[in-house]
């Protein structure tokens, strides 16, 4: 089920605090490291760079206007796809 229309989009309070602090100190080019992958990207985040934790490292995510309304976790994959093993048959001549 989707979130109720009556409720505002979820964004963790500590993420909002970090963003407000970065905007107040005019540190728009610095990376803001966050663990909250479930937070929704808001309008005030446009132009900022976030380091979204994927369980091992912080993946840099530069927010643009196409990302509004989506979650941070969508841009930081947690699993690494190694691909399928190729066909190991021996070719005969």
UniProtKB/Swiss-Prot annotation:
GO terms for molecular function: rRNA binding; structural constituent of ribosome. Keywords: Ribonucleoprotein, Ribosomal protein, RNA-binding, rRNA-binding. Signal peptide: none annotated. GO terms for biological process: ribosomal small subunit assembly; translation. Pfam families: Ribosomal_S19 (PF00203). Gene3D superfamilies: 30s Ribosomal Protein S19, Chain A. PROSITE patterns: RIBOSOMAL_S19. SUPFAM superfamilies: Ribosomal protein S19. GO terms for cellular component: cytoplasm; small ribosomal subunit. Protein S19 forms a complex with S13 that binds strongly to the 16S ribosomal RNA. NCBIfam families: rpsS_bact. Belongs to the universal ribosomal protein uS19 family. HAMAP family: Ribosomal_uS19. This is Small ribosomal subunit protein uS19. It comes from Ehrlichia ruminantium (strain Gardel). The lineage of its organism: Bacteria, Pseudomonadati, Pseudomonadota, Alphaproteobacteria, Rickettsiales. The gene is rpsS.
């Amino acid at each position: 089920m989707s979130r109720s229309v009556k409720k505002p989009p979820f964004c963790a309070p500590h993420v909002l605090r970090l963003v407000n602090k970065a905007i107040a100190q005019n540190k728009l080019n610095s990376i803001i490291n966050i663990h909250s992958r479930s937070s929704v990207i808001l309008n005030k985040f446009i132009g900022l760079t976030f380091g979204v934790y994927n369980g091992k490292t912080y993946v840099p995510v530069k927010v643009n206007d196409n990302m509004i309304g989506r979650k941070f976790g969508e841009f930081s994959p947690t699993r690494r796809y190694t691909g399928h093993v190729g066909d190991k048959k021996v070719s005969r001549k």
